[in-house]
Structure formats: C-alpha cells, structure tokens
Amino acid sequence: MLVFLSLELGMPQVRTAGKAIPTVYDKDAPAQVPTYLQTDGRWGALPYAGDDIATSGCGLTSAAMAYTSLTGEEWTPLRLALTVGDMCTTDGLNDMQKFCAWMRANDGSLSSTGLLYDQQEALGYAGRGWMVFGSMTGQLHEGGRAYGGHIVLICGWDGGTADIRDPDEGQVNLNTDEFASVSWAYFIAIGSD
C-alpha cells in the first residue's frame, strides 16, 4: 500500500490507493508544554546575552517553551534565539516583558500582564492555562541548584501543585508550601482567555 502526504488546497491529507483521507486535528485539545533545557547540545553553545544559551539563556529557553505551548508550533530555543537575537535582553539580562511584547506582536490572540508580585495571582493565571514567567533567586526546590537570578516557566496550577519547567533542571512540581518558600522577585503571565 502506497501512503504519502499531500498539501492540496492547503489542507494536509493522507493518500492511500489514490483516495484522499483528510487529516483531522483536535483544536480543542490542550497544547503540551515541552521541556527544553538551556544546556542542550543543539543550542547551548549559541552566543546569547554576552555569553551563551547554556549560561545566560534561562529566560530565552522559558520563552521558547511558553511560545511553543501557546501557538502549538515548535519554537526551540535555537529557533527563538535566531529570530530575536538579543533584542529581548536589557543590559545582558533576559527581559521577560520584551519577550511577551514580541510574542503579542507575532500572535494577536495573546495578552500579557505587567509585572506581578503576588504569588496567588500568578498561580491563578497558571491555573487558567496561561504561561507564567517567574524570576527567582536561591533554590527552586530542596536540594536544587542555587541561582543568583533565574527565570522559570510556571505552566500549571491545580490548586495544590504548581507545574514548573526549569530550563536548567527540567520539570519540577511544587506544592503550595514549597512554592511559597521560593524567593520570587516577580512574575509575568501571557496567554489568552
């Protein structure tokens, strides 16, 4: 049996024995949040923010995970870095407000907040399906690496557990008390209702 993909009329179709079978997508299915690591060999050594992605790309990597989830299109840290360069940094640091502005400019369905300082408000956005960037210092979790400054992506909240993508460590889940014990500086949420 011969099977191939066709893009006739802009709609992907599978053809088998000359008959087109339309490809069906579940548009209502929630988008998955990928786990990208800033140290990944595919992009870690790429120059970024005066250093490289492995060293300085926590915000870029978090933005790539968020934008991939929000758009349903794959935006790896490599692709995002090649697209935005250093324009989403300020004084060599990741500027999540600039990343949010870039995302909104490229997808008119997205909205973002200003800086948020209330943990419960940030978790509320994560519980609604928005992507929330969290700026923190110290350890994200007991036994984890200590950071002088770090950006993570809070991508879920079920009322008791925060689902976090740490671009340095991967997926981390924190309960309410663990989340409250993190030294958070600010949050910024982006998404659509």
Residue ranges and their predicted role:
Residues 1-92:
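Active-site-adjacent structural segments surrounding the nucleophilic cysteine of cysteine proteases
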